Amino acid sequence: MSDHKKAILAGGCFWGMQDLIRKQPGVVSTRVGYTGGQNDHPTYRNHPGHAESIEITYDPAQTDYRALLEFFFQIHDPTTKNRQGNDVGTSYRSAIFYVDDEQKRVALDTIADVDASGLWPGKVVTEVTPAGEFWEAEPEHQDYLERMPWGYTCHFPRPDWKLPKRADAKA
């Protein structure tokens, strides 16, 4: 039996999210897809209400959910509603789809730390909602930037971005 855990995050175009998150220590695998919408079996051309998302399988002996969330908040702008870079619409919203109550607690705590830190110019608008069905995207979207390294992305690591705990954050 595997001790691996799952996380489902949305923060703009799934290509850039996957490219950066898959390289993080403790991440075992990733796949991009759609979740949080109205229709079953969504596709790139038909995914009303769904967010472009990434399902992350990680080894909790090497990383934890909090570390994944801190990196997630570093690589996308969680203060813009339904937008990342040039991508606009609910497909590109910032969202955390939690799989259990502990993930929900950690997500809300991390958001409070991000808000208190002043690292972003506004308040976090990231949705925190229970995970529903995750629909894997078409094969051409999987590991897209690994195959097309000069392809489109709006995600960038911010190397000096370090999230302090609330007690250490600016008032």
Curated annotation (Swiss-Prot):
Keywords: Oxidoreductase. InterPro entries: Met_Sox_Rdtase_MsrA_dom (IPR002569), Met_Sox_Rdtase_MsrA_sf (IPR036509). It comes from Mycobacterium sp. (strain KMS). Has an important function as a repair enzyme for proteins that have been inactivated by oxidation. Catalyzes the reversible oxidation-reduction of methionine sulfoxide in proteins to methionine. It comes from the Bacteria. The active site is at C13. NCBIfam families: msrA (TIGR00401). This is Peptide methionine sulfoxide reductase MsrA. The keyword S-adenosyl-L-methionine does not apply. It catalyses: L-methionyl-[protein] + [thioredoxin]-disulfide + H2O = L-methionyl-(S)-S-oxide-[protein] + [thioredoxin]-dithiol; [thioredoxin]-disulfide + L-methionine + H2O = L-methionine (S)-S-oxide + [thioredoxin]-dithiol. GO terms for molecular function: L-methionine:thioredoxin-disulfide S-oxidoreductase activity; peptide-methionine (S)-S-oxide reductase activity. Its EC number is 1.8.4.11. PANTHER family: PEPTIDE METHIONINE SULFOXIDE REDUCTASE, PEPTIDE METHIONINE SULFOXIDE REDUCTASE MSRA 2. One of its GO terms (biological process) is protein modification process. The gene is msrA. Gene3D superfamilies: Peptide methionine sulphoxide reductase MsrA (3.30.1060.10). Belongs to the MsrA Met sulfoxide reductase family.
